[in-house]
Every structure is written in C-alpha cells, then in structure tokens.
Amino acid sequence: MAKKALISVSKKEGIVEFAKKLNELGYEIISTGGTYNLLKENRVNVVKVSDITGFPEIMDGRVKTLHPKIHGGLLAIRDNEEHIKALKEHGIEPIDIVVINLYPFKETILKENVTLEEAIENIDIGGPSMIRAAAKNYKYVTILVDPKDYDTVIEEIKQYGNTKEETRFYLAAKAFGHTALYDSLIYNYLIQKNNIEFPEVMAFAYEKAQDMRYGENPHQKAAFYKNPIKAYGIAECEQLHGKELSFNNINDANAAIELLREFKEPAAVAVKHTNPCGVAIADNIYNAYLKAYESDPVSIFGGIVALNRTVDVKTAEELIKIFLEIVIAPDFEEEAFEILKKKKNLRILRLKEGYEKEYDLKKVEGGLLVQEKDEIDLDENNLKVVTKKAPTQKEMEDLRFAWKVVKHVKSNAIVLAKDGATVGIGVGQVNRIWPTEQAIKQAGSKAKGSVLASDAFFPFPDVVEAAVKGGITAIIQPGGSQNDALSIEAADKGGVSMIFTGIRHFKH
C-alpha cells in the first residue's frame, strides 16, 4: 500500500516541488480546492479528497475534510490491533504526512474596511482539525505547517525511509504553536469587536523575530518576538547599517521611540538604560540634537539617539563626533547616511510611520499585570495654578515640555527644563528629594531660570525649597498630597509659580 500525504495550503511557496519529491518517493498525494488545481496543473500525481471520502465538498467548501476517512486515517494508532481492524472494516487508509497552513485570517483582518462577515469566512475549521489530529498522532504522522521544514522531511525520508520520531515530535509542537497563534488572532479580533477591554482570558501569541546573542546580561538566554498583527515601533524598524541589535539595544530603542512620539515639533531624544538623558525640541532637527546633546554630554556617550525628522548632513556630522549605539530617524539624506556609515558599528534604524494602542504588560511571578498604556494628554482646562504667581508664557511652554519628558523617566522622577531642552534629570530614587537634588546638581548653573516637573506629588515642602534655592522659577506636579498647602506656601515664599495637573505619571 502506497504511503499517503494530504496537502492543503493557502501559502503555496515550495509546495509543488515538495509534492513532486513525495511522488518520487512513492507517496500518493491527496488534496483539496486550489491546492489540488495547482498540483494538477504542475503534473503532480494527486487525487481529490472527495475521491477518498466518496463525499463532495459542500456549503461553499466549508465541509471538505471533516470526514471519518480523513480523520480516521490521521488518528489511527498503527500498532493498535483494534484501530487497524477499524480501518479495514470501514475502508480507511492511513495518512502518513499532512501539509497544511490555514486560511489567511490575519491577512484578511489587516485589510482596510474588512467586514465581520469576511473575517468569519476566513476562519479555517477543517485545517486546524487536521493539524491537531496529525500532531496528536505524531508517533505515526508527520505534520508540516511551515515550508522551511520541507527539505528536512524529504532528506529524512530519503535517508531513513521515514521521518525520525524526534523530528515528528518537534513538528507536532510547532503545529500546535501554529494553531495557538491562529486561534489567538481570532479570539482577540472577536474580543475587540465586542469592545471588551479586559476579558476573562488573556491570550497573546507572538512570532519569533530573532534569537538574541544573550539577554540583559551575557549569562541570560533571550529571543525577540513580534506582535503578528500590530506592526509598528521598534519591532518594525528597518536596520540600514551596523551590528545586530542586542536585547538592551531593542529595549532602549523602544524607550526612545515612545518618548519621541510625545512631540510633533522637531525633537531629539537621547536614552541610556531606558531613561532619557537628554531631550530637546527646536525649529529644526539639527538644533534639536545639539540641545539634547548639551543637556548631558557625559551620559549620552554610548547611548541611543532618536530623531523625528529626516537626518541631514549637518546633523549626521554632529552625530558621528561621539560614540553612539544607535541612531533612529524616519529617514536619512543620502549623503548623511554615507557619513553615518563611516561608523562601522553604529546601528542605523529607519523608523516607519504608524502606531496602534495595545496593553502595557508587566510580568510578575506566576502572573501578568495588564493595564492601559499611560497615554493621557495634559488637559489645559484642568490645569490649576495654585500659587499667587502664575507661570509666564515661556515658562508654560517649558512646563508642558518637561511634563511630557517626566512621564518617561523611572519613578521617583524629576525633570528640569529650559528653552525647550532638559537641563537636569533625576531618575529612579526612593524618595522625592533625592531626584530633585540629583537634577539640580546635574543642571549646575543651568538650573537658574529652569522649570521643574515631578511625576508625582510632593509629600513635603522640601522639593519646593530645594527648587527655590536652585533658582527654579516654575513647577508642574500632580498635587493631591496632604501637605499641598505647605508646598504652596513654600512656593509663594520663594516667588515660584506652581501648577497642579491632577494626573500622576509613575513609571516602574
């Protein structure tokens, strides 16, 4: 009895060549619909599923392979006498290889203006059923869902007369991953259509983009996975030059891109260890970068710079003056790109347009914290001047700028800004006075005339007192402390204006 392979694929890559090789190795090919027609046109020896089942495709192809002669052939345990007896009694022949990839549900829902009905029609039923049946019976059946595995299967059949059990076991696991991804796409699409923000079950499936050399540290193994639907941000950056991105590169670049999105005007963001070390806006990208660099010329060394305008020659010439890990921008002038390429190891990334909202996830031991991203805008109507003195227009511009930056600094966070640039950043301290002192010390003489943004309220007036002493002229903070009155009193005493936003921006 000839061995049998059932082939039904939506992605036709390499399938004709694979089927022909199976023919040469003595396999009878069974197929359906478009795959059958393609194989037949290319002179592959193939029979229709309906010829095996004795039952036609019905309901516009919704029912094709859901038949005992297919699933019995897939699920029969070959060394079980009762199973073999059942096969013979019902005229069922074993199926040894199954090659399937599923209806293009992902591609369908990514189309513009796709209807729910169109999406539903692209939910595969027979395909996942056959994949699961074949994978369950991996000891006897080889299941293929990825064209990358075709050559391995052919080589093993040539060498051993069949695939090795360890290969079948691996392919079975891969097959269940394939259906898990498929089901998660359907589930999340339908949850979205039901407008459910936090469903009873969280089902995420990501596709591996690359293996990393190592993780956050050299002793940690790591890989990078992409969202198969929401393609944007660091996951979709195009690398134009330089070494492969590391785990930390990707993490830091992501932080830089998230902060960069806060600004519509030309902006430059420098990041180290996911924290901004220099941020600036200006009338052009060259000036924005110069201001960001001058914010902290020490910490930017070995950092990541993200820009939201095309990099010109002048800017490129400045960028190569120091060691940077990565430069990110929406585009690069040709000559500017050639200048940057002189730095052999500099990673150059082109940031593509596009952004989609998704959950902010935090892994904890034994669980997952899920929340909306912190993307609330500053509502000018809700700003409350709580001091006798109000900020000037120039101070107000810097306060808005500093507020955007402080949201992206690890708590407890303080940002000092002046003339559209950070001059001091206090990062990740366990009380509020220490990051204030850190930021003022870093700013030095630039602290005088700057403004201060705090990610959370002041529990004591000491922050305001330090700000007054450092020459800071205006403060923006959430407010809401039991001691707000003391902080307001200190601000009035020091001649400093202060605004409450009513919004906290903790970042952990």
From Swiss-Prot:
InterPro entries: AICAR_Tfase_dup_dom_sf, Cytidine_deaminase-like, MGS-like_dom, MGS-like_dom_sf, PurH-like. Its EC number is 2.1.2.3, 3.5.4.10. One of its GO terms (cellular component) is cytosol. Pfam families: AICARFT_IMPCHas (PF01808), MGS (PF02142). Residues 1-145 form the MGS-like domain. It comes from the Bacteria. Pathway: Purine metabolism; IMP biosynthesis via de novo pathway; 5-formamido-1-(5-phospho-D-ribosyl)imidazole-4-carboxamide from 5-amino-1-(5-phospho-D-ribosyl)imidazole-4-carboxamide (10-formyl THF route): step 1/1; Purine metabolism; IMP biosynthesis via de novo pathway; IMP from 5-formamido-1-(5-phospho-D-ribosyl)imidazole-4-carboxamide: step 1/1. Keywords: Hydrolase, Multifunctional enzyme, Purine biosynthesis, Transferase. One of its GO terms (biological process) is 'de novo' IMP biosynthetic process. GO terms for molecular function: IMP cyclohydrolase activity; phosphoribosylaminoimidazolecarboxamide formyltransferase activity. It catalyses: (6R)-10-formyltetrahydrofolate + 5-amino-1-(5-phospho-beta-D-ribosyl)imidazole-4-carboxamide = 5-formamido-1-(5-phospho-D-ribosyl)imidazole-4-carboxamide + (6S)-5,6,7,8-tetrahydrofolate; IMP + H2O = 5-formamido-1-(5-phospho-D-ribosyl)imidazole-4-carboxamide. The IMP cyclohydrolase activity resides in the N-terminal region. NCBIfam families: PRK00881.1, purH. Belongs to the PurH family. This is Bifunctional purine biosynthesis protein PurH. The gene is purH.
